C-alpha cells in the first residue's frame, strides 16, 4: 500500500480506536470527522470519551475540506476524514491543515482501499490509515479483520502494544 508498517487487528473499528489511543486522544478532546459515516467511525471516538465534531460532505459524500477549518478549536486533537466508495477526502488540504494547526490525521479508509490522489493511496496520507476487512468491504476475509498502516516508528511500536491489550 506504500507504508513502512501494517498492524493487523480484529476490525476496522479497532483500527480507528487504536489509532486514536496511540495518539493519546481522550476525555475532553475533539475529533473532526465526516457527517456521512458509519457508527464504527464515531463509536471509537465516544468510547474514549472524546467528542466527534461533524463536517458536512461534498458531492462525493466525503468530508468537504472547505468546511473543516471553521470547526477547529483549542480542543481539536485529531482529524478523522472518511474515504467513501473509492473516493477520498482531499488529503492535500487535510495535510495542510494538519501542518498548520499541528493536528494529526487518522484516515478511515475502510471503504476506499484502492482510492488514490496523485498516485498516493488512501490510508497513506495521515499518521495512520485504518482499513476494514469485513465481508461487506472492498477487500474482505471470511469473518472480520482490520489493518492499521503507518510510517511512524514510534506509533508502530505503540500500536503493536495496544493490539495486545497494552495500555
Regions picked out by a protein language model, each given a short descriptive name:
Residues 1-19, 33-37, 55-56:
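Short loop-beta-helix segment that forms the pyridoxal 5′-phosphate
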Residues 9, 34, 82, 132, ...:
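Conserved residues at the C-terminal ends of beta-strands
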Residues 11, 57, 84, 135, ...:
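Short, conserved catalytic or interaction motifs in soluble domains
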Residues 21-109, 116:
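PLP-dependent aminotransferase-like
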Residues 112-118, 125-167:
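Active-site region of PLP-dependent enzymes
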